[in-house]
A protein has these predicted regions:
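Long, C-terminal-biased catalytic regions of enzyme "large/alpha" subunits
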Residues: 2-177
């Protein structure tokens, strides 16, 4: 995510950056729940789903409303979530994808239930992604454009963020080599 925002020339804490992050999170979570519903069709819903069906579907509908950018009309929520900021998302395809996948997740979930009660977690950053050619490893911005990874056998491995040249070009900087 950090590399995507950098390559797009968007500030991590800009309205546009937050909107892209929210759209990506909505797509990932909606896809995971749609897949969970497909699994429930084949393997059955999670234990306890029948008892919690109404509450689970209400949660899913509220997730869909947030993914659609709804400011109100949430079901049985005292505090409304921060909805996807549709107006500030510079990529309308992400918005449309989020809307479609949440519609699909609800449709499938109403028919088959869900195999999983929870489908996503955002883990802390790790360094494995850096040696797999990922310029950023988590949801936060890159902590350094040049990093040194200590090797178990001794020595260091230099890792350079390869997104910087694209980000500078996107922001209008000229290559003066």
């Amino acid at each position: 995510l950090g590399a995507l925002l950098m390559a797009s020339g968007l500030g991590y804490d800009s309205a546009e950056g937050r909107a892209i992050a929210a759209a990506v999170a909505a797509i990932m979570t909606g896809t995971a729940y749609a897949t969970s519903a497909e699994m429930a069709k084949l393997m059955g819903a999670f234990p306890g789903y029948a008892k919690n069906r109404d509450a689970m579907l209400r949660v899913m509908r509220n997730h869909r409303r947030a993914a659609q950018g709804a400011g109100s009309d949430y079901e049985k929520l005292a505090i409304h979530p921060v909805a996807l900021d549709v107006a500030n998302c510079p990529d309308s395809a992400l918005i449309e994808a989020a809307r479609r996948i949440w519609d699909r997740a609800i449709e499938l979930g109403e028919k088959h239930g869900f195999r999983n009660a929870q489908v996503s977690v955002i883990a802390p950053t790790g360094t494995i992604g850096l040696v797999m050619d990922c310029d950023t490893t988590g949801i936060e911005p890159d902590f350094a454009l040049v990093k040194f990874k200590k090797l178990a056998g001794g020595g260091y491995f230099k890792i350079i963020n390869q997104t910087v040249p694209l980000a500078l070009k996107t922001l209008g900087y000229k290559d003066e080599t």
